[in-house]
Amino acid sequence: MLWPSTQRDFLLSLAFEGAYRFVFSEAILNEVEVNEEIKRLERGDRPEDAQAKAHHLATRMRTVFDDSIVRDWEGLEGSYGLPDPDDEHVLAAAVVAGAGSIVTDNLRDFPPEMVPAGIQIVSARDFAYETVSMSPDLGLAAVQAMSRRTGRHHPALAVSEILATLDKLYGMNDTTEIIRDLLHPTTAPG
C-alpha cells in the first residue's frame, strides 16, 4: 500500500482523517525509504537529492503517525513460512499490532492458509473502496487534503485531477465514484 506514491498519499490521508488505524514497523518504513530513493534516482534526481527526499518522506511518516509504529515484532519474523521470506516482517508486525488487514497488491506472497485468522489480505484498490464506502465523508476529506498539499513544488492539483489519477493509475473507479457523488449530489425527482 505504501507504493506507489499517489496511492500511498491517498491511503495515508484516509488514515489521517480517521477512516482506519494505520500501523507499520521501522522495517516497513525502511523499505519505503529505500524504494523512494531508488525511484527518484531512476527519475534522474541527483543521489544526494534522492536520498534527502526519501529520508524526508520516512521522517514525515514517523512524525505524523508516531503512535502507529509497531515494536517488538521481531520474535515472530520467520514463523509463518510465507513464499517470500522478506515479507515475514510485514505479517509479524500485523500480528503484534492486532491489525485486521494487510493492504498489499502482492497477494500471492500472502497465501490465506499461512496468514493467522483475523487478518485479511486485501488489495489497495479493494481496501480503498471498503474504507471509503464506510466513511464517504472521510474519503472526500482525504482527497481535499491531498489537493491542499499540492502546488509547492509542482502545479496544484484539483480534487477532480486527483480522482482522475486514482482512476487511471490505480483502478479505483468504484472508490472515486463514491467521492464524486458527494461532490455532485443528485437530487431525487419530486
What are the residue ranges of the model-derived segments?
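Acidic, metal-binding active-site segment of PIN/NYN-like and related structure-specific nucleases
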Residues: D87-I121
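Short, basic, glycine/proline-bearing loop/turn elements
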Residues: D66-Y80
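Acidic, PIN/NYN-like endoribonuclease modules and their adjacent C-terminal/linker elements
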Residues: R108-G190
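A generic structural signal for alpha->beta connector loops
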Residues: A19, D66-D67, G118
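Short, well-structured N-terminal submotif of metal-dependent ribonuclease cores
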Residues: M1-E26
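Conserved nucleotide-binding/hydrolysis micro-motifs of P-loop NTPases
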Residues: M1-L2, I28-L29, R108-F110
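PIN-domain endoribonuclease scaffold, especially VapC-family toxins
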Residues: A27-V70, R149-T165
